[in-house]
Amino acid sequence: MINEMKQDAKNRMEKTLSVYLSDIDGIRTGRARTSVLDGIVVETYGGRVKLNTISSISVSDNKTLMIKVWDSNNIGAIKTAIMNSNLGFGFSCEATTIRLTVPEMTQDMRKNLVKLLGKISEDCRVSVRNIRRDIMDKLKVMQDNKEISEDDLRVSGTEIQKITDDVMKKINDAFSSKEKELLQV
């Protein structure tokens, strides 16, 4: 039962970390990266679909993304979705290809993105601590009900804290790396 609780804590924390890493990967850094377009949804075919399901997206150079649209009827809808995304990209169209130019980031933009990164990172840390607290509360209830001993509770608490520390280190490392990337001119 204790091992299941530890595994549950680890799985939940790793899932939180995974969501965090994908969230910060979407933060624009001034370089062309396809992941910046992951959240763009296009209204076409009578519904809403992700941009990467109706086109292929690639990095042309350091400042340019290329979108090869599979159906030329979708170009207008894709242009509208890109404009509505407020990413600030300039773009040009050639037949079934859209070229997006990533604008230079100002120092203020970089500072604001670092603040956003800090907020996202802190939210993730809070989530991980809440998972730890939830598991520890469950273990304390088990100890109160005499399902586990006080020693088992202490050992489990130490092991869960180690899992928490490992995940927190990964969060801090990802934060530092992304912050460096954002502040690099």
From Swiss-Prot:
Pfam family, any one: RRF
User: Under which name does UniProt file this protein?
Assistant: Ribosome-recycling factor
Subcellular localization, per the record?
Cytoplasm
Q: Which organism is it from?
A: Ehrlichia canis (strain Jake)
Note the SUPFAM superfamilies from the entry: Ribosome recycling factor, RRF
Q: Could you give a single Gene Ontology term from the biological process aspect?
A: translational termination
What is the first-listed, main subcellular location in coarse terms? cytoplasm
Keywords from UniProt, A to Z, are:
Cytoplasm, Protein biosynthesis
Gene designation per UniProt? frr
Q: Known InterPro entries for this protein?
A: Ribosome_recyc_fac (IPR002661), Ribosome_recyc_fac_dom (IPR023584), RRF_sf (IPR036191)
Which Gene3D superfamilies would you find in this protein's record?
3.30.1360.40, Ribosome-recycling factor (1.10.132.20)
List the GO terms this entry assigns under cellular component, sorted alphabetically: cytoplasm
Q: Does the keyword Protein biosynthesis apply?
A: yes
What is the similarity comment for this entry? Belongs to the RRF family.
**Primary role:** Responsible for the release of ribosomes from messenger RNA at the termination of protein biosynthesis. May increase the efficiency of translation by recycling ribosomes from one round of translation to another.
Residue spans making up a coiled coil are none
Q: Name one GO molecular function term.
A: ribosomal large subunit binding
